[in-house]
Amino acid sequence: SRGLGDVYKRQASIQRALARFKKHHSDLKDLPNKVVFQMNDTHPTVAVAELMRILVDEEHLSWDDAWDITTRCVAYTNHTIMAEALEKWPIEIFQRLLPRVYQIVDEINRRFVMQINERYPGNEDKVRKMAILYDGQVKMANMAIVAGYSVNGVAKLHTEILKNQELHDFYEMFPEKFNNKTNGITQRRFLAHANPLLADWATKKVGAGWITDLTMLSKLKAYADSPVAQQEFAEIKRANKVRLAKYIKEHNGIDVNPDSIFDVQVKSCLLYTSPSPRD
């Protein structure tokens, strides 16, 4: 399955990174100074357990030393507040497919639940919300938060919702981990490379410095009311639509009218990201 294939890829990535590290360094305690595994959403979270497995089983470190290294080597980016987008595995399947990795997860969970009970004695609701293993499921997001030295959202509002609502219990316990990193795009890829006609037009207006200093594009405001600049901009937009229509015809055999409105989503179509109909 795709899910299991993804797990094997994460394991291979961890193994390769450690092999490369050991070529140049002898002390694994130096790993956090050289390597960070950024878990981009919950799908790569098995990296936590795989790194622990290698450090304990293959490098023969104590659990405490391995955990100290791991928790300084992994960080977690949360992309959504929607529960269905946070990966969960049925314990039965996870245990059968990855028996040793599951044992590691089980021990991480056991120790963390002890922490919860020390902090909130007798509060089963906290355990229910925060445990990695609960109600027959492996909750990958919980493992990412427990292990990661950093937990970030991708917009200010998103991060505040995580802290105050969706992940509030974790924020209450680990406030120092939470921070915001606003998502964005790079003008080098999405303008200079992807839209050469518009990139050339911008360079003619404000110079080439915008390629490395995005703030320079604000100088284009001076042309906002210029009929000539507006016409040039419109011509570039239409030329790009004609180019896309030609590509669609050549690759998909579909005729597209370049004078129609193009509503394009460059994104994988998943249940929680599929575009909704426009009015």
Residues of each region from the PLM?
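Structured ligand/cofactor/substrate-binding pocket environments in proteins
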Residues: 1-21, 35-46, 142, 146-161
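Function-dense linear segments that define catalytic or interfacial modules
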Residues: 1-2, 6-36, 184-221, 236-239
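Conserved small/polar residues in nucleotide/adenosyl-binding loops
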Residues: 3-8, 272-279
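Secondary-structure transition/capping motifs at alpha-helix termini
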Residues: 20-32, 55-68, 80, 115, ...
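Core structural elements
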Residues: 38-50, 73-77, 240-252, 266-274
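Extended, well-ordered alpha-helical scaffold/bundle regions in very large, multi-domain proteins
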Residues: 58-106, 110, 206-215
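Polar, glycine-rich mid-to-C-terminal structural blocks
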Residues: 106-137
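Segments forming glycine/polar-rich beta-alpha architectures that bind adenosine-containing cofactors
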Residues: 154-204, 274
